[in-house]
Amino acid sequence: MKRQKWIHEGLITESPSNGMFRVRLDNXDLIPSYVSGKIRRSLIRILPGDKVKIEVSRYDSTRGRIIYRLRNKDSKD
């Protein structure tokens, strides 16, 4: 049976250390998150201010895993 996950969108507020990030969700919660292995292998750079998708376990909702970095839609270059 596959584990159940919640997927949320949020904004990276800071990156304190060791690949951990603090993500502010749309409902104003602040969750520490780490980068998934596929993003790490693809060398995708995540910086404060980026919008990301994270998945949170239903069993431990105190931390999440960043699974996707959303593109900036406001840049018209």
UniProtKB/Swiss-Prot annotation:
Q: Which GO terms describe its cellular component?
A: chloroplast; cytosol
| Start and end residues of each S1-like domain | 1-71
Which InterPro entries does the annotation name?
A: NA-bd_OB-fold (IPR012340), RNA-binding_domain_S1_IF1 (IPR006196), TIF_IF1 (IPR004368)
A GO molecular function assigned to this protein is: translation initiation factor activity
Q: Where in the cell is it found?
A: Plastid, Chloroplast
Give the highest taxon in the source lineage. Answer: Eukaryota
Indicate the quaternary assembly. Answer: Component of the 30S ribosomal translation pre-initiation complex which assembles on the 30S ribosome in the order IF-2 and IF-3, IF-1 and N-formylmethionyl-tRNA(fMet); mRNA recruitment can occur at any time during PIC assembly.
PANTHER family under this entry?
TRANSLATION INITIATION FACTOR IF-1, CHLOROPLASTIC (PTHR33370:SF1)
Know the name of this protein?
Translation initiation factor IF-1, chloroplastic
